[in-house]
């Protein structure tokens, strides 16, 4: 793995570790970060702290289309926890990246399939949405 990707992963994990009142736990964001890199040239770390929903927590009104992608992803993870009774941060799934196209592979549980699709749809949304530099660290 590229050292820059490891740095991004560490920064995202550190920023998300304070997202709950329980003791911080290792979070599985490796796959999501790699999915983002599959179809986006912007470094994954650029998304953490963007708008009101990208990164740790999320509240208020999304500032733009990209921030809405993060809000939808947050809600998707929430649904994984409540409806599918799984922890999306600990769920490892199978996927493929080929020529910028993401495909969730044959995952043997509903939880894995659901979380994979949360991440795939968010990565695709990130790739399509404009990134407005002034919205980084700018929740209005």
Swiss-Prot record:
CDD domains attached to this UniProt entry: PLA2c
Disulfide partners: 38-97, 52-139, 54-70, 69-125, 76-118, 86-111, 104-116
Catalytic residue positions: 73, 119
Localization annotation: Secreted
Glycosylation sites: 39, 107
Reaction catalysed by this enzyme: a 1,2-diacyl-sn-glycero-3-phosphocholine + H2O = a 1-acyl-sn-glycero-3-phosphocholine + a fatty acid + H(+)
Top-rank taxon, per record: Eukaryota
MF (Gene Ontology): calcium ion binding; calcium-dependent phospholipase A2 activity; phospholipid binding; toxin activity
Enzyme class at the top of the EC tree: hydrolase
Propeptide: 22-27
Residues annotated as binding Ca(2+): 53, 55, 57, 74
Pfam families: Phospholip_A2_1
Recorded coiled-coil stretches: none
PROSITE patterns: PA2_ASP (PS00119), PA2_HIS (PS00118)
Keyword terms: Calcium, Disulfide bond, Glycoprotein, Hydrolase, Lipid degradation, Lipid metabolism, Metal-binding, Secreted, Signal, Toxin
Cofactor entry: Ca(2+)
Bound cofactor: record note: Binds 1 Ca(2+) ion.
Job of this protein: PLA2 catalyzes the calcium-dependent hydrolysis of the 2-acyl groups in 3-sn-phosphoglycerides.
UniProt-recorded name of the protein: Phospholipase A2
Organism: Micrurus altirostris
């Amino acid at each position: 793995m590229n050292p820059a990707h490891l740095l991004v992963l560490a920064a995202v994990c550190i920023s998300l570790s304070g997202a709950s009142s329980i003791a911080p736990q290792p979070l599985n964001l490796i796959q999501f970060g790699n999915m983002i890199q599959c179809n986006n040239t912007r470094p994954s770390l650029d998304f953490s702290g963007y708008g009101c929903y990208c990164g740790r927590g999320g509240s208020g009104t999304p500032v733009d289309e990209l921030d809405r992608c993060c809000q939808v992803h947050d809600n998707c993870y929430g649904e994984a926890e409540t409806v599918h009774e799984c922890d999306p941060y600990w769920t490892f799934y199978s996927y493929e990246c080929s020529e910028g196209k993401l495909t969730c592979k044959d995952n043997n549980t509903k939880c894995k399939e659901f979380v994979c699709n949360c991440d795939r749809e968010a990565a695709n949304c990130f790739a399509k949405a404009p990134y407005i530099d002034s919205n980084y660290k700018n929740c209005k």
